[in-house]
Amino acid sequence: MIPLSTYIHGINPGEQIRLSILNELLNQRCLEKITLKPAARILDVGSGLGLMTECLSKKSGPGGYCLGIERDDEQIEKAQKHQTPELEFRKGDAYQLPLKEDEIGSFDIVYSRFLLEHLSDPKRAIEEMLRALKHGGQIILSDDDHQSMILYPEPEGFQKLWTAYIDSYITIGNDPFIGRKLPRLLLDNGCKEVRNDLVFFGDMAGSPTFEAYTKNLSEVIATARNLMIENELISPDEYASAMKNLITWTKMSHATAYYPLCIATGKKF
């Protein structure tokens, strides 16, 4: 039996808003790392609300086709409202992509972001992505390595809070350090010309996006609150104090955050 995945952040309306903000902050930076030939066929696995999928479709240009696969009912319903002949969304699972027979091995690009960290068997998901990719096509994986978060000056209690957040991933079988492993996963799946890169996902006080950035940070931690406390990774008082200090930090004129999003690319031959 293929192990199921667990999405730590939940699927409530607040999480959908957070994901929209996250896309606004990050999509353009990620697009700058991607080179597409005109009219490319693109598959986005774990497409969520479809905002990045739509960006990929626009970048591909006239004659291109972009297919987003997402398993969550609410997210796929919202994404499908933006469908066009060149942009399609389907409900499906990363372990068993809902592809037609003539779509197997037909995509120029397979893209996946913020998916593998939530899967119990990322290698199996990559195998399925490569099944969809044509020979000579490129797979692009982007994901977190949570140990890379740096806040300056560090709010009191943040280190324990962030460690508890990381450990909450581990308690449900997810991988908070998947980002550093992406090149190895591609090599283990037979990819060639494997390369690694980073997208800077930091910010600082005074930036026009800092408020949205820190809102995303505090909300993503809050999604794991119950899991952290139930597993005694942090006490309720320690959590409340650290979150209060984090909010205070966001008001500092020199508050600075550094965080890299890990990328790995490879080709199928």
Regions found by a protein language model. Name each.
Residues P3-E24:
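Class I SAM-dependent methyltransferase Rossmann-like catalytic core
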Residues L43, L49-L97:
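Class I SAM-dependent methyltransferase SAM/SAH-binding core
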Residues R195-F269:
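Conserved Class I S-adenosyl-L-methionine
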Residues I140-P208:
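Conserved catalytic/acceptor-binding region of the Class I
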Residues I21-P38, C55:
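Conserved alpha-helix/loop element of class I SAM-dependent methyltransferases that forms part
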Residues K123-Q138:
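A short glycine-rich, Lys/Arg-flanked "PGG" loop and its adjoining helix->strand segment in the class I
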Residues P98-I109:
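A short acidic, Gly/Pro-enriched loop at the edge of an enzyme's catalytic core
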Residues D108-D121:
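A short SAM/SAH-binding and catalytic strip from SAM-dependent methyltransferases
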